[in-house]
Amino acid sequence: MDFDEFYRDTSRRLLRYAYGLTGDPVEAQDLVQEAYARAWQRRRRLAGYDEPEAWLRLVVNRLAADRWRRLGVRRSRAAAAGPPDPVAPPSENVVLLVRAMRELPVTHRRALALHYLLDRSVAEIAAETGVATGTVKSWLSRGRAALAAELSKGNNEPEGAGHVR
């Protein structure tokens, strides 16, 4: 496996996945960078895997979970402050969506990110997460319902926006 080519082919998808999990572009970049550093160290073994990109997503998922446990209160404060402005700001809809996704349980957020951001099927998500397809369908259904509820709340509007009554 040519690692440079593997990186070029997978890095954008992996970054989208990490951003979907964290809601923070800087944290997402850190997770992806660490995942590729680990992949580089294991590149010979990784070349033998059927799905090396799935291994990378698993590493990102575990790194994110580790950081959430370690950061605790600091992460809550950072999330309340919102993500830093990226070079090319995301659309208003993306900001609202990510803000709402932060409120979801991690299982729902992960399933939604895999399904909608990485176009993974229910069967692929089930295989990657080690659960039954029915569980994935439940996560997606509950995640969509919770996401709809979050998006319908007034507190997900951009600053300065208000309701006209």
Task: Describe the function of each predicted region.
Residues 1-16, 26-29, 40, 109:
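A short, charge-rich alpha-helical start-of-domain segment used by transcription regulators
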Residues 2, 128, 145-165:
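C-terminal edge and immediately downstream basic/flexible tail or linker adjoining helix-turn-helix-like DNA-binding
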Residues 11, 15, 36, 105, ...:
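C-terminal flanking helix
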Residues 16, 30-37, 41, 50-62:
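Structural recognition of an alpha-helix C-terminal capping motif at a helix-to-coil junction
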Residues 41-48, 58-79, 90, 153:
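Arg/Lys-rich amphipathic alpha helix in sigma70-family domain 2
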Residues 61, 65, 129-153:
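DNA-recognition helix of helix-turn-helix
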Residues 66, 74-101, 121, 156-164:
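Internal acidic/polar
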Residues 111-115:
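A short pre-motif secondary-structure segment
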